[in-house]
Amino acid sequence: VLDTETGNMMEYRHLIGNPRYKKDWGISFGNEIGRLAQGMPGRVKGTDTIHFIHKHQLPADRWKDVTYGRICCNYREQKEEKNRTRLTVGGDRINYTGDCGTPTADLLTVKLLLNSVISTPYVKFMDIDIKNFYLNTPMPRFEYFRLKLDNFPEDVILQYGLREKVSSDGYVYLEVRKGMYGLPQAGILAQELLEERLAKHGYTQSKHTPGLWKHKWRPICFSLVVDDFGVKYVGKEHADHLVAALKEDYEVETDWEGTKYCGITIDWDYKKREVHISMPGYVNKACIRFEHEKPTRKQDQPHQHTIPTYGAKIQFAKEADTSRPLDKEEKRYIQKVVGTFLYYGRAVDPTMLPALSAIASSQATPTEETMIKTKQFLDYAACHPDAIITYKASDMVLATHSDASYLSEPKARSRAGGAFLPIQRCT
């Protein structure tokens, strides 16, 4: 969570240690425990996903499988409960031998679906969100994790009698009986159950495009990203059919305007047959997080350009980078910048991708030169904070276009770019 006063990013331990945030985020975590466990009276209903147990109740053959829990906080403006806390399980210590791969729609599939909506007459778009998607999936094999008693708000401690269950080393042990965030098997188990339930109503997932679902005869299809449905439909009665099918087994939220999906803001203009996608405010928040101010001189170039040697018949590669290696904190800073902006670049601002690719290629062993590239990139981002991509109706016939630059990367490498664009009217 971003502290707008200091620009620092705060985790749960920081939030409950700050008098300004302690009450609100304590309530948020209490609600999360209630959802996962057996509820919090008057606030949330439980899903029986987790059960608090005594340490001696752990099966003797599962001691080595006990993992940790992590409390993740996020502020979600578009959600009904804006202070969002999620308790996740340390999946890196789970010994699950089955297949954990979960088909999910990638950004290319999502963008093609949006393009298809405005390219097809009489089509509309909506999105559906399943609440507690993972938490409704029974698991044949239970998992176990532990948390410090100090992490729990007082009302949760009293509600579940945790002082009677805490171990001598201050930990509370939990048994996971249904799918939960962080478990490597949670995604595939939840999707297999969804597939079984929707098949009864005529919906199946594409064999060739992960995360794309269709009905066997209704004019409706949707992309699925974890628990978010982006639905393309002709005729509201067909969308109502999907919503009703989901409501048989899940609690769902619907947005009939289809204005938000995968963190992307969507502005539909069905009359002009255009759609505009953006992520307003994302870059500004990132710049505050990285304590990077907008430069006084506008930066219109996301990465350095390679100056050619004019008149030379042969262009030689740049000399090797011999600048100072970065320390651990500086290296982590580089990695955070790349991780933060990569999704934004892929989603709405592809002009950032060559620069991010160049920085990412050296983030394992970054140098002072890498930091200079990163600062220039942040200057560019700060000067161009709210990119918008507009898709116009097309015949949805795809052509391949590619291009490459010569000796523009270290070690005599070239930078290549590729794109798939509709042949008729492009973006």
Regions found by a protein language model. Name each.
Residues 1-427:
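Long, low-complexity, charge-biased intrinsically disordered regions
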